[in-house]
């Protein structure tokens, strides 16, 4: 049985939890995307499981995660975390 995995971008991989939390908060993602970011980036919950929690399609989560990753990476860089 295959299990879904969370793949963090290299630039976010080495961040401490507190840095990740700060980058997510400072990225101003909005309520839903902030929740998705926390579940995906901090809790390491696979996209399919996040989709089930929200009652959305996995593809919707996938599109949002791409945007979230871009914003969080950019914010982490501005905060000199990366």
Task: Describe these PLM feature segments.
Residues 9-26:
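Short, Lys/Arg-enriched N-terminal segment that forms or immediately precedes the first helix
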């Amino acid at each position: 049985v295959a299990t879904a995995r969370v793949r963090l971008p290299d630039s976010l991989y080495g961040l401490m939890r507190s840095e990740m939390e700060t980058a997510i908060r400072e990225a101003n993602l909005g309520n839903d995307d902030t929740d998705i970011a926390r579940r995906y980036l901090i809790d390491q919950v696979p996209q399919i499981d996040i989709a089930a929690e929200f009652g959305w399609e996995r593809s919707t989560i996938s599109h949002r995660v791409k945007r979230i990753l871009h914003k969080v990476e950019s914010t982490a860089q501005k905060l000199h975390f990366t």
